[in-house]
Amino acid sequence: YDKIVDAAWRNGEPGIVFIDRLNRDNVVPSQGRIESTNPCGEQPLLPYEACNLGSINLACFFVPGHEHDEDPAAAGIDWDGLKQVVHLAVRFLDNVIDASRFPLERIDETVRRNRKIGLGVMGFADLLFQLGIPYDSEAGIALAERIMGFINAEGHAASARLAEERGPFPAYAESVFPQRGEGPYRNATVTTIAPTGTLSIIGGCSSGVEPLFALCFTRNI
Protein backbone atom coordinates (compact mmCIF):
# COMPACT_ATOMS: atom_id res chain seq x y z
CA TYR A 1 0.00 0.00 0.00
CA ASP A 2 2.83 2.41 0.85
CA LYS A 3 4.42 1.77 -2.56
CA ILE A 4 1.10 2.50 -4.29
CA VAL A 5 0.66 5.75 -2.36
CA ASP A 6 4.25 6.83 -3.05
CA ALA A 7 3.93 6.10 -6.77
CA ALA A 8 0.62 7.95 -6.99
CA TRP A 9 2.19 10.96 -5.28
CA ARG A 10 5.13 10.93 -7.70
CA ASN A 11 3.35 10.49 -11.04
CA GLY A 12 -0.38 10.01 -10.49
CA GLU A 13 -0.32 6.26 -11.16
CA PRO A 14 -1.67 3.73 -10.44
CA GLY A 15 -5.35 4.50 -10.08
CA ILE A 16 -7.26 2.22 -7.72
CA VAL A 17 -10.83 1.04 -8.26
CA PHE A 18 -12.77 -0.92 -5.65
CA ILE A 19 -15.06 -2.82 -7.99
CA ASP A 20 -17.21 -4.28 -5.20
CA ARG A 21 -17.93 -0.78 -3.91
CA LEU A 22 -18.91 0.36 -7.39
CA ASN A 23 -21.34 -2.51 -7.77
CA ARG A 24 -23.07 -1.71 -4.50
CA ASP A 25 -24.19 1.52 -6.19
CA ASN A 26 -24.98 -0.04 -9.57
CA VAL A 27 -28.41 1.42 -10.43
CA VAL A 28 -29.12 -1.22 -13.10
CA PRO A 29 -27.86 -4.48 -11.55
CA SER A 30 -30.32 -6.44 -13.70
CA GLN A 31 -28.27 -5.40 -16.73
CA GLY A 32 -25.01 -6.86 -15.42
CA ARG A 33 -22.09 -6.12 -13.13
CA ILE A 34 -19.85 -3.10 -13.47
CA GLU A 35 -16.50 -4.39 -14.72
CA SER A 36 -14.51 -1.23 -15.28
CA THR A 37 -14.61 2.53 -15.74
CA ASN A 38 -13.87 4.87 -18.59
CA PRO A 39 -10.15 5.83 -19.00
CA CYS A 40 -10.14 8.60 -16.37
CA GLY A 41 -12.12 6.55 -13.85
CA GLU A 42 -15.06 8.86 -13.20
CA GLN A 43 -17.74 6.77 -14.94
CA PRO A 44 -18.33 3.12 -13.91
CA LEU A 45 -19.61 1.12 -16.87
CA LEU A 46 -21.18 -2.23 -17.66
CA PRO A 47 -19.66 -4.42 -20.38
CA TYR A 48 -20.20 -2.90 -23.85
CA GLU A 49 -21.44 0.38 -22.38
CA ALA A 50 -20.54 3.99 -23.14
CA CYS A 51 -21.53 7.29 -21.53
CA ASN A 52 -21.72 10.79 -22.98
CA LEU A 53 -20.01 13.37 -20.77
CA GLY A 54 -20.40 17.13 -20.51
CA SER A 55 -18.99 19.75 -18.15
CA ILE A 56 -20.29 23.14 -17.04
CA ASN A 57 -17.79 25.98 -16.54
CA LEU A 58 -18.76 27.21 -13.08
CA ALA A 59 -16.66 30.37 -13.41
CA CYS A 60 -19.17 31.63 -15.99
CA PHE A 61 -21.82 31.94 -13.27
CA PHE A 62 -19.89 34.30 -11.00
CA VAL A 63 -21.74 37.50 -10.10
CA PRO A 64 -19.25 40.21 -8.98
CA GLY A 65 -19.73 42.50 -6.02
CA HIS A 66 -20.51 39.97 -3.28
CA GLU A 67 -17.03 38.79 -2.30
CA HIS A 68 -17.30 40.40 1.14
CA ASP A 69 -20.81 39.16 1.93
CA GLU A 70 -21.26 36.79 4.85
CA ASP A 71 -22.32 34.17 2.30
CA PRO A 72 -20.65 35.28 -0.95
CA ALA A 73 -22.08 32.32 -2.90
CA ALA A 74 -25.70 33.23 -2.17
CA ALA A 75 -25.73 36.24 -4.49
CA GLY A 76 -22.28 35.71 -6.01
CA ILE A 77 -23.47 32.76 -8.11
CA ASP A 78 -26.15 33.01 -10.78
CA TRP A 79 -28.18 30.05 -9.52
CA ASP A 80 -31.05 30.66 -11.95
CA GLY A 81 -28.65 30.70 -14.87
CA LEU A 82 -26.96 27.55 -13.62
CA LYS A 83 -30.34 25.82 -13.38
CA GLN A 84 -31.18 26.72 -16.97
CA VAL A 85 -27.84 25.42 -18.23
CA VAL A 86 -28.18 22.16 -16.28
CA HIS A 87 -31.58 21.47 -17.83
CA LEU A 88 -30.31 22.38 -21.29
CA ALA A 89 -27.19 20.22 -20.87
CA VAL A 90 -29.20 17.17 -19.77
CA ARG A 91 -31.44 17.51 -22.82
CA PHE A 92 -28.41 17.96 -25.07
CA LEU A 93 -26.58 14.92 -23.70
CA ASP A 94 -29.70 12.81 -24.08
CA ASN A 95 -29.92 13.94 -27.70
CA VAL A 96 -26.30 12.91 -28.23
CA ILE A 97 -27.22 9.31 -27.37
CA ASP A 98 -29.66 9.20 -30.28
CA ALA A 99 -27.23 10.95 -32.62
CA SER A 100 -24.31 8.64 -31.79
CA ARG A 101 -23.22 5.65 -33.83
CA PHE A 102 -21.24 2.84 -32.24
CA PRO A 103 -18.89 0.24 -33.77
CA LEU A 104 -20.77 -2.76 -32.35
CA GLU A 105 -24.49 -3.44 -32.23
CA ARG A 106 -24.18 -4.69 -28.65
CA ILE A 107 -22.72 -1.35 -27.55
CA ASP A 108 -25.55 0.46 -29.30
CA GLU A 109 -28.16 -1.71 -27.55
CA THR A 110 -26.59 -1.33 -24.09
CA VAL A 111 -26.17 2.43 -24.38
CA ARG A 112 -29.75 2.99 -25.54
CA ARG A 113 -31.17 0.63 -22.92
CA ASN A 114 -29.66 2.56 -20.01
CA ARG A 115 -29.15 5.98 -21.61
CA LYS A 116 -26.44 7.01 -19.15
CA ILE A 117 -25.17 10.58 -19.27
CA GLY A 118 -22.55 12.28 -17.13
CA LEU A 119 -22.92 15.99 -16.49
CA GLY A 120 -20.10 17.47 -14.46
CA VAL A 121 -18.24 20.71 -13.80
CA MET A 122 -14.98 22.51 -14.42
CA GLY A 123 -13.73 25.91 -13.32
CA PHE A 124 -14.46 25.25 -9.64
CA ALA A 125 -11.09 26.58 -8.47
CA ASP A 126 -11.60 29.68 -10.61
CA LEU A 127 -15.00 30.27 -9.03
CA LEU A 128 -13.50 30.03 -5.55
CA PHE A 129 -10.88 32.63 -6.53
CA GLN A 130 -13.62 34.93 -7.79
CA LEU A 131 -15.65 34.54 -4.60
CA GLY A 132 -12.61 34.97 -2.35
CA ILE A 133 -13.03 31.53 -0.78
CA PRO A 134 -9.84 29.51 -0.09
CA TYR A 135 -9.81 26.13 -1.82
CA ASP A 136 -8.56 24.31 1.29
CA SER A 137 -11.21 25.69 3.65
CA GLU A 138 -14.41 24.41 5.21
CA ALA A 139 -16.26 27.05 3.22
CA GLY A 140 -14.73 25.68 0.03
CA ILE A 141 -15.83 22.14 0.87
CA ALA A 142 -19.31 23.33 1.80
CA LEU A 143 -19.64 25.21 -1.49
CA ALA A 144 -18.58 22.12 -3.46
CA GLU A 145 -21.32 20.11 -1.75
CA ARG A 146 -23.82 22.91 -2.29
CA ILE A 147 -23.11 23.27 -6.00
CA MET A 148 -23.07 19.57 -6.80
CA GLY A 149 -26.18 18.97 -4.69
CA PHE A 150 -27.89 21.65 -6.76
CA ILE A 151 -26.67 20.24 -10.08
CA ASN A 152 -27.59 16.69 -9.07
CA ALA A 153 -31.11 17.70 -8.02
CA GLU A 154 -31.75 19.85 -11.09
CA GLY A 155 -30.15 17.28 -13.38
CA HIS A 156 -32.48 14.55 -12.16
CA ALA A 157 -35.44 16.93 -12.38
CA ALA A 158 -34.50 17.56 -16.01
CA SER A 159 -34.17 13.83 -16.66
CA ALA A 160 -37.60 13.24 -15.07
CA ARG A 161 -39.10 15.91 -17.32
CA LEU A 162 -37.55 14.25 -20.35
CA ALA A 163 -39.03 10.93 -19.23
CA GLU A 164 -42.47 12.55 -19.35
CA GLU A 165 -41.79 13.78 -22.90
CA ARG A 166 -39.88 10.86 -24.37
CA GLY A 167 -40.37 7.97 -21.96
CA PRO A 168 -37.99 6.58 -19.31
CA PHE A 169 -34.85 4.66 -20.20
CA PRO A 170 -35.91 1.15 -21.29
CA ALA A 171 -34.34 -0.61 -18.29
CA TYR A 172 -36.01 1.73 -15.76
CA ALA A 173 -38.56 -0.85 -14.53
CA GLU A 174 -35.70 -3.26 -13.73
CA SER A 175 -33.54 -0.61 -12.07
CA VAL A 176 -33.28 0.33 -8.39
CA PHE A 177 -35.33 3.51 -8.83
CA PRO A 178 -38.88 2.05 -8.61
CA GLN A 179 -37.94 0.37 -5.32
CA ARG A 180 -36.77 3.73 -3.99
CA GLY A 181 -39.84 5.55 -5.27
CA GLU A 182 -37.68 7.67 -7.56
CA GLY A 183 -38.31 8.69 -11.14
CA PRO A 184 -39.11 7.67 -13.72
CA TYR A 185 -35.99 9.12 -15.30
CA ARG A 186 -34.88 9.35 -18.90
CA ASN A 187 -31.32 8.43 -17.93
CA ALA A 188 -29.93 5.74 -15.61
CA THR A 189 -27.17 8.12 -14.49
CA VAL A 190 -27.08 11.90 -14.79
CA THR A 191 -23.94 13.32 -13.17
CA THR A 192 -20.24 12.54 -13.06
CA ILE A 193 -17.21 14.76 -12.55
CA ALA A 194 -14.44 14.29 -15.10
CA PRO A 195 -10.94 15.79 -14.74
CA THR A 196 -11.54 17.77 -17.99
CA GLY A 197 -7.84 18.02 -18.79
CA THR A 198 -8.54 18.97 -22.41
CA LEU A 199 -11.98 20.57 -22.07
CA SER A 200 -10.68 23.04 -19.49
CA ILE A 201 -7.98 24.19 -21.93
CA ILE A 202 -10.64 24.84 -24.56
CA GLY A 203 -12.81 26.60 -21.96
CA GLY A 204 -9.91 28.57 -20.52
CA CYS A 205 -10.66 27.52 -16.95
CA SER A 206 -9.35 25.32 -14.15
CA SER A 207 -9.86 21.60 -14.62
CA GLY A 208 -12.71 19.68 -12.97
CA VAL A 209 -12.92 20.31 -9.25
CA GLU A 210 -9.14 20.32 -8.88
CA PRO A 211 -7.07 23.21 -7.49
CA LEU A 212 -4.66 25.03 -9.78
CA PHE A 213 -1.29 23.28 -9.48
CA ALA A 214 0.61 26.58 -9.94
CA LEU A 215 -0.16 30.29 -9.97
CA CYS A 216 1.58 30.66 -13.33
CA PHE A 217 2.24 27.92 -15.88
CA THR A 218 2.43 27.19 -19.60
CA ARG A 219 0.73 24.22 -21.21
CA ASN A 220 1.80 22.96 -24.62
CA ILE A 221 -0.88 21.19 -26.65
Stretches found by the model and what they are:
Residues V85-D108, R112, I133-T196:
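Internal maturation/activation junctions in enzymes
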Residues Y1, T37, G183-R186:
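Short solvent-exposed loop/turn micro-motifs enriched in small/polar/acidic residues
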Residues I16, T191-T192, I201:
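Short beta-strand scaffold segments in enzyme catalytic cores
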Residues L131, L143, M148-G155, S200-I221:
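Catalytic phosphate/nucleotide-handling subdomain of diverse soluble enzymes
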Residues Y1-G32, H66-P72, V121-F177:
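Conserved, charged catalytic cores of large soluble enzymes
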Residues A8-V111, K116, G123-L131, C205, ...:
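Function-dense linear segments that define catalytic or interfacial modules
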Residues K3-V5, C40, T189-V190:
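A generic hydrophobic-helix recognition signal that picks specific residues
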